[in-house]
Regions:
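Metal-cofactor-binding active-site regions of metalloenzymes
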Residues: 28-517
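Secretory targeting and sorting signals
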Residues: 2-27
Length: 517
């Protein structure tokens, strides 16, 4: 959707001073299947593991592929939300910190006060994010999810400006691809669902929703909304001009989210709308289910929602499915609710990717489930900080290492980096420190994030069992000037083009790191 400009390697060279003090690695080192440069950089990484500043600098400049699990309203910084609230003349209650339209009465203060009054600003930031949060009467889970209701009024009027901040941040982190979640035509879908009602006969319900162009009207509305958001985005970023900001280089796709805690009629309507969008507009790549998985309505209707997806999936083969599943932990729900969500999301809900998957070890016959995930190449989107803040699951209690040991593909993601007050480098740093990842591990995590992205076209790689290039692109070093056959492949296949670009970024990164020695 957006891929207008490629970033340079100037920032890589700028970090050389932090990386320079190490002695050079042995020049001839080479990893199996890798380049000599790769082996030398791997040794370099091993030498800076205990140096926080140099490790952070190294990981910040590392090409990190894509972010596959990202909620736009939770990804934008709290500071930008405050700024937007002030510009839009909103109010913020000084006791509940809920944003609302004016006039500001009683305990409500103008949002502008959070710009000029530092004490109030700090209170708002703490209420709208996880900054300085310490569990007490309120759990991390409850505080995290409550933030969305507090800043909600400030988070929907300027999606283009919000996306601009997110993609600029990603470009600074050397990421090139984003899938972010939005609720398309939210009000219209809710109204249509209320008018139509629910029917366990999904085929009949679908026909009623499609009748008289009702869903198509919402499709057209959602596409128009995205057109306007992207116009705002491109205006903010100056894309296509000499002043283009770095975020213009990030390719963006949208996941249409459905609210799993809503009434069944609304969930079905939202899923159907998302499927139709993915079939008509390549910018809308997939559908997902959001809201806490542990809410009672989510638990009560879990099987029903998976059956909805089972019905819709064969009707919309171009619509990808990624599902939040297993964002649970013992004590949050009763034991029975930990036993099947991931398995059912894959086998019934046709999920190609799973977001979170934290409770996998609690599922029935978890060893068989892990084999199934590995055999089917179902990717797990892993937001380590989010899982710690919401579920208090981290370190060796987290299944990240278990998934990797079991051959299940994984990719690091941010989830809601604005709420969490983190970025993707923080997640890579956390993973390296906790799980002793090698340089090859890091490259493969980044490669996997692009390989499993829902961006169109063929892959650069022969298959998902390793990173061996397809025949058309084997005659030149990856990421350099391609042969005519390879160039044709890259021209016609956006996924392969992103992957080739990343291989070039790896080469630039490795050369810059070693020049800084």
């Amino acid at each position: 959707m957006i891929s207008l400009r490629r970033t340079t390697t100037a920032a890589l060279v700028a970090c050389a001073a932090l990386l320079a003090p190490l002695a050079p690695a042995q020049a001839g080192t080479q990893l199996p299947g890798g380049r000599p440069l790769e082996g030398r950089v791997a040794a370099f990484l091993d030498g800076i593991r205990q140096d926080p500043a140099r490790l952070d600098a190294f990981l910040r400049q590392l090409p990190k592929g894509g972010d596959l699990h990202n909620h736009l309203s939770g990804a934008v910084s709290t500071e930008l939300l405050i700024q937007l609230a002030a510009e839009d003349g909103l109010c913020i209650d000084s006791e509940t910190f809920v944003s609302a339209t004016g006039p500001c009465q009683g305990t409500a203060r103008p949002a502008q006060d959070a710009v000029t009054d530092q004490d109030f600003r700090t209170q708002v930031i703490r209420s709208w994010s996880m900054q300085d949060f310490a569990p007490g009467q309120e759990s991390g889970h409850d505080h995290f999810f409550a933030t969305f209701g507090k800043f909600g009024e400030a988070s929907w009027r300027h999606p283009g400006r919000m996306l601009a901040e997110v993609t600029d941040t990603m470009a600074a982190q050397h990421q090139s691809y984003l899938e972010t979640m939005l609720t398309p035509a939210s009000g219209g879908a809710a109204a249509l669902a209320a008018k139509t009602g629910f029917d366990q006969d999904f085929a009949a319900l679908r026909q009623r929703l499609l009748a008289d162009g009702q869903i198509q009207t919402l499709v057209d509305q959602a596409r128009g909304d995205l057109d306007r958001a992207m116009a705002e985005y491109q205006d903010t970023e100056h894309c296509g001009t000499a002043q283009a900001r770095p975020g213009c280089a990030v390719t963006v796709r949208i996941q249409s989210q459905a609210s799993r805690a809503a009434a069944p009629a609304r969930v079905f309507t939202q899923l159907l709308l998302g499927m139709e969008l993915a079939s008509q507009d390549q910018r809308f790549a997939a559908v997902n289910l959001v809201q806490p998985e542990d809410y009672q309505a989510s638990l009560d209707n879990y099987d029903l929602q998976m059956r909805m997806l089972d019905f819709l999936h064969p009707l919309y083969p171009n619509a990808h499915i990624s599902l939040h599943a297993g964002e649970l932990a013992p004590g949050l729900v009763k034991p029975e609710d930990l036993r099947f969500h991931i398995r059912q999301a894959v086998l019934t809900g046709h999920a190609e990717r799973i977001g979170h998957g934290v409770d996998v070890a609690n599922e029935d016959d978890s060893a068989d489930l892990l084999r199934t995930l590995a055999e089917r190449k179902v990717l797990i989107e892993v937001p380590l900080t989010s899982n710690d803040q919401i579920l208090q699951v981290s370190g060796q209690d987290h299944p990240f290492a278990l998934y990797r040991k079991s051959g299940v593909p994984t990719a690091l993601s941010t989830d809601d980096p604005g709420v969490e007050r983190i970025d993707i480098t923080h997640e890579y740093l956390r993973a390296v420190r906790t799980y002793q990842l090698t340089y090859r591990d890091l490259k493969d995590l980044a490669r996997t994030s692009l390989e499993y992205g829902f961006v169109g076209g063929r892959s650069l790689w022969q298959d998902r069992n390793g990173y061996r290039p397809v025949a058309e692109c084997q005659d030149r070093p990856l990421g350099t000037k391609p042969t005519s056959a390879c160039a044709a492949l890259l021209r016609d296949n956006p996924k392969a083009a992103l992957e080739w670009q990343q291989e070039g970024a790896f080469r630039d990164f490795e050369q810059a790191v070693l020049r800084g020695k």
